[in-house]
């Protein structure tokens, strides 16, 4: 087999990609990523030993985080970057060995060098649990990277990441120990999302109810995609007064909800939809596009010269803006000045900004609506969007929900229904968008607040159903976080993860009520009877 990857929802045949990734990843790139993941596990093995001796190396901790983020689906397609990261990892391993040895520690660790890659673990269930843990750690890394960009860090979370990665090399750990580690990963996932929430809100203010323009103006523009709020802050500052407008795309939409960004008159609104439509939407935008994180779709020749990457992202032939304090966006700004204004593809407004602080401010109104029966049930429909036509299920599901149901969402899954006219209940919109995928944390805070207000003992007693669309590894850490918090009866779609072996899937079904989706009518009946 030339390659094997099943980390995302688009894994070929719900089994795995073996020739080329559906994402566009080549065999050579897949092998480089496998080798980098193995390198990170070995570095983590020594990092754990070093930490036992109070040898904490922030540079190595950050290297692990950034490298994991680069391997997330659709983040980086540049083989050279992975070669550099592998070489850097080998250097760090030797550094750690010297430090451990000098401190009298053990350097005779089992690096398991016989084989690398997913299939190097023969036992299907152990392999499944190791990958579940690895993908959760990848998702966590993304959130830690964004928090660190705003100078918020947590050494304990980074210590757990090394512990978890090292554990995937330990053949003495059985299924029970790995399940426990996965749930512990969920605990640290909550911590990571809380850290990022704190970083974002203390830096830019709490998101607030906002109507976001989805039309265009007649100035040239820059389209910023991905998740990194530090990047959009620096871009807005540097484009001010230049005659260049700024638009968000896909997961950057929630930047419009933050008070700190509303002062910029050239911050127009949001252009387009979820990541997978970018081939058409980047073409019609006419101006340059800045990818701050995933998701990159292999670009068309017609606009690749207008595309820029930054941070951990990369694509061969695409210009990369290096890190800096601040980053220098002058090249993309000058490029924009030479481009035509965006072609308008839609008009109107969408509403969002319902993160935990805003919803809790409306708590009295929400509680009264629940008590009066005006709101019968909340549906958490957070997660990711994707190319599969089966994802139209989520549009149909939103349309078919009874008028007394409210959707709580975060992540690009929202694009399946955030432009539908679903109305409101007593002034409360029936789609409450908390923000990016990491803002699933807000939905947890809201649920815990409602549990407190209603005096319930168990979060599962709330009238909340979980119908989550997943795509990549950030959705995995959100899932593990929910499981850690004791949330049960979560349904995942459009398919269950290919990396869950039948036995591991059974454990999740039996212990947590995890399920898939069937059809809209039957699923709504099922949720109403939970």
UniProtKB/Swiss-Prot annotation:
CDD domains: HCP (cd01914)
Molecular function in Gene Ontology: 4 iron, 4 sulfur cluster binding; hydroxylamine reductase activity; metal ion binding; peroxidase activity
Cofactors: [4Fe-4S] cluster; hybrid [4Fe-2O-2S] cluster
Cysteine persulfide, modified sites: 384
SUPFAM superfamilies reported in the protein's UniProt record: Prismane protein-like
Reaction(s) this enzyme catalyzes, per UniProt: A + NH4(+) + H2O = hydroxylamine + AH2 + H(+)
Pfam families xref list: Prismane
Residue numbers binding [4Fe-4S] cluster: 5, 8, 17, 23
UniProtKB keywords: 4Fe-4S, Cytoplasm, Iron, Iron-sulfur, Metal-binding, Oxidoreductase
One of the GO biological process terms: response to hydrogen peroxide
EC nos: 1.7.99.1
InterPro entries, per the entry: HCP/CODH, Hydroxylam_reduct, Prismane-like_a/b-sand, Prismane-like_sf, Prismane_a-bundle
GO cellular component terms given for this protein: cytoplasm
Cofactor note: Binds 1 [4Fe-4S] cluster. Binds 1 hybrid [4Fe-2O-2S] cluster.
Positions of hybrid [4Fe-2O-2S] cluster binding: 227, 251, 295, 384, 412, 437, 472, 474
Subcellular location: Cytoplasm
Highest rank taxon of the organism: Bacteria
Coiled-coil parts of chain: none
Family per similarity comment: Belongs to the HCP family.
Functional summary from the UniProt entry: Catalyzes the reduction of hydroxylamine to form NH(3) and H(2)O.
Alphabetical list of PANTHER family matching this protein: HYDROXYLAMINE REDUCTASE (PTHR30109:SF0)
Name under which the protein is recorded: Hydroxylamine reductase 1
Biological classification of the source: Bacteria, Bacillati, Bacillota, Clostridia, Eubacteriales
């Amino acid at each position: 087999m030339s390659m094997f990857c099943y980390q995302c929802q688009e894994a070929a045949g719900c089994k795995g990609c073996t020739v080329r990734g559906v994402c566009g990843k080549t065999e050579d790139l897949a092998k480089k990523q496998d080798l980098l993941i193995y390198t990170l596990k070995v570095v983590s093995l020594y990092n754990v030993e070093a930490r036992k001796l109070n040898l904490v190396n922030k540079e190595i901790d950050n290297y692990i985080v950034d490298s994991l983020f680069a391997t997330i689906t659709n983040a980086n397609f540049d083989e050279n970057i992975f070669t550099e990261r592998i070489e850097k990892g080998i250097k760090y391993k030797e550094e750690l060995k010297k430090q451990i040895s000098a401190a009298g520690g053990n350097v005779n660790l089992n690096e398991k060098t016989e084989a690398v890659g997913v299939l190097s673990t023969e036992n299907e269930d152990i392999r499944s649990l190791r990958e579940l843990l690895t993908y959760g750690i990848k998702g966590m890394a993304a959130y830690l990277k964004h928090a660190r960009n705003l100078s918020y860090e947590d050494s304990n979370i980074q210590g757990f990441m090394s512990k978890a990665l090292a554990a995937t090399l330990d053949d003495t750990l059985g299924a029970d120990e790995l399940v426990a580690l996965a749930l512990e990963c969920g605990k640290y996932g909550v911590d990571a999302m809380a850290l990022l929430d704190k970083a974002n809100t203390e830096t830019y203010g709490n998101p607030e109810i906002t109507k976001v323009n989805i039309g265009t103006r007649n100035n040239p523009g820059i389209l910023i995609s991905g998740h990194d709020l530090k990047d959009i802050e620096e871009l807005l500052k540097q484009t001010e007064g230049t005659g260049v407008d700024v638009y968000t795309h896909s997961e950057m939409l929630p930047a419009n909800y933050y008070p700190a960004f509303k002062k910029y008159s050239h911050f127009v609104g949001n252009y387009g939809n979820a990541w997978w439509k970018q081939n058409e939407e980047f073409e019609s935008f006419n101006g340059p596009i800045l990818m701050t994180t995933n998701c990159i779709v292999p670009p068309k020749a017609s606009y690749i010269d207008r595309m820029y990457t930054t941070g951990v992202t990369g694509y061969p032939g695409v210009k990369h803006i290096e890190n800096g304090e601040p980053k220098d966006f002058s090249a993309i700004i000058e490029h924009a000045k030479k481009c035509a204004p965006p072609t308008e593809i839609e008009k109107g407004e969408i509403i969002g900004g319902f993160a935990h602080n805003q919803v809790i401010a409306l708590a009295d109104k929400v509680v009264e609506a629940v008590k009066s029966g005006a709101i019968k049930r909340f549906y958490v429909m957070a997660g990711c969007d994707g190319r599969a036509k089966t994802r139209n299920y989520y549009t149909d599901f939103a349309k078919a929900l009874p008028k007394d149901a409210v959707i709580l969402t975060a992540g690009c899954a929202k694009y399946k229904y955030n432009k539908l006219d679903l109305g409101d209940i007593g002034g409360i919109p029936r789609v409450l968008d908390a923000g990016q995928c990491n803002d699933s944390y807000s939905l947890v805070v809201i649920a815990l607040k409602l549990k407190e207000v209603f005096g319930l003992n168990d979060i599962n007693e709330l009238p909340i159903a979980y119908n989550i669309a997943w795509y990549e590894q950030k959705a995995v850490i959100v899932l593990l976080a929910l499981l850690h918090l004791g949330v049960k009866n979560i349904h995942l779609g459009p398919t269950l993860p290919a990396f869950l072996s039948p036995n591991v899937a059974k454990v999740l079904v039996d212990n947590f009520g995890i399920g898939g989706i069937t059809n809209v009518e039957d699923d709504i009946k099922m949720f109403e009877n939970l």
